[in-house]
Amino acid sequence: FFTKAYSILDLIVKIAFELENPIESFSSITKLKSSEKIWGNRKQLRMNGTQDTIFEDCIVIKQIEALRNEAVHNGTWEFAPKVFLRIEDSTIIERYMLFPDFEEGHLATVKNRRHFFSSGTKVNDALIPIHEEFYRRLLTTLQNIVKYNANVE
């Protein structure tokens, strides 16, 4: 989810950048202005910082960035992934993994160590609110892009 969500952030930056900087001449085929733009270039957009969008500084987007970067650059958010079992009367009731600890959207860190699970938050309990908030912000972002560009002519 986190890698795909981050890719969506990249794509939205490209779309917003193209719409904010439209092609003025179609006499030749030119490279898209957004071809080199990625999520890190969002600060160049007029929409950057817009409330309730993916461009607003918020914990959910920071968590997506942090977990995507951790997975891409370090392979996982836990060095030795563990699945925990809850057993009652010799029957497995639940299987779960723990979600890493965060401080203001960033992985909790102590002296270059980032893999802490002291909060005991289960992945399934954390993933649903992150997913819902991300898509709510994404929808608001797209609505703002459409509304802004409908008025630009």
Which role fits each region the language model picked out?
Residues F1-A5:
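Extended HEAT/HEAT-like alpha-solenoid repeat tracts in very large eukaryotic scaffold/adaptor proteins
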Residues Y6-V13:
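Alpha-helical repeat scaffolds in large eukaryotic proteins
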Residues K14-E153:
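Acidic, Ser/Thr/Gly/Pro-rich intrinsically disordered interaction regions
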